[in-house]
């Protein structure tokens, strides 16, 4: 009796193994994706045609080689150069605001992969570090300082949205004029005195003053 039981058990195991051998290939075949020739595949986002007269914006702030302080959203000069090299190697073409406005008004179209480079807040590092890099690449950019920060007298701390900041970290008007005279940089305005947070609701949430007081 035990022999018969063992025989039946072994037969069941063999039946399962045989079924897996015969039926598994059919299951595997269903899981194998159908081959699609490269020319027939859908284009991914990186391969799709660049939309007409569209551009992307890359926004930078401070460029600091001593400490890349994230309170100022800082990046090191070597990292900035690496990013610029990547943009150039991948076909991105920096454009000016003047080019963008002209394209929107029926003028010359923007190039494919048009890119607007902006540097906010008006750090003096733009004069010392960024401008030489822009000259090397011959790329346009936008510098948008905060008016009252640039107005801060020498020797006084700048109230950087509640963060006490050394005056020399912010550009002077003389430096901004030299930057504008370079022919590569357009000067914008990162507000005159609205670059700080205020309580935006009864719950105490903080929001930029520019969007809560206008």
Features from the language model and the residues they span:
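Bacterial N-terminal signal peptides
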Residues: 11-22
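Boundary at the C-terminal end of the N-terminal hydrophobic targeting segment
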Residues: 27-29
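Alpha-helical scaffolding within the catalytic cores
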Residues: 39-46, 100-104, 127-130, 163-180, ...
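C-terminal domain-boundary segment and adjacent tail
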Residues: 75-109
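Substrate-binding cleft of extracellular glycoside hydrolase catalytic domains
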Residues: 118-124, 139
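Bacterial N-terminal signal peptides that target proteins for export
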Residues: 2-13
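Aromatic- and glycine-enriched glycan-recognition loops and surfaces
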Residues: 73-88, 122-124, 166-174
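Metal-dependent polysaccharide deacetylase catalytic core of the NodB/CE4 family, i.e.
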Residues: 58-66, 70, 113-115, 135-214
């Amino acid at each position: 009796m035990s022999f018969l039981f063992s025989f039946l058990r072994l037969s069941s195991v063999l039946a399962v193994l045989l079924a897996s051998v015969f039926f598994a290939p059919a299951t595997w075949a269903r899981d194998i994706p159908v081959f699609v020739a490269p020319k027939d595949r859908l284009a991914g986002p990186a391969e799709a045609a660049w939309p007409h007269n569209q551009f992307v914006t890359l926004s930078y702030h401070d460029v600091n080689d001593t400490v890349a302080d994230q309170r100022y959203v800082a990046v090191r000069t070597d990292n900035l150069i690496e990013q610029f090299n990547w943009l150039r190697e991948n076909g991105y073409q920096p454009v000016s605001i003047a080019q963008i406005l002209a394209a929107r008004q029926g003028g010359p179209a923007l190039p494919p992969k048009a890119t607007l480079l902006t540097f906010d807040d008006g750090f003096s590092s733009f004069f010392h570090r960024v401008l030489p890099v822009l000259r090397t690449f011959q790329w346009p950019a936008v510098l948008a300082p905060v008016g009252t920060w640039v107005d801060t007298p020498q020797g006084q701390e700048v109230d950087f949205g509640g963060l006490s900041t050394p005056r020399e970290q912010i550009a002077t008007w003389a430096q901004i004029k030299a930057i504008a005279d370079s022919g590569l940089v357009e000067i914008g305005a990162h507000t005159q005195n609205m670059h700080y947070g205020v309580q935006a609701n009864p719950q105490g949430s903080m929001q930029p003053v520019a969007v809560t007081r206008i």
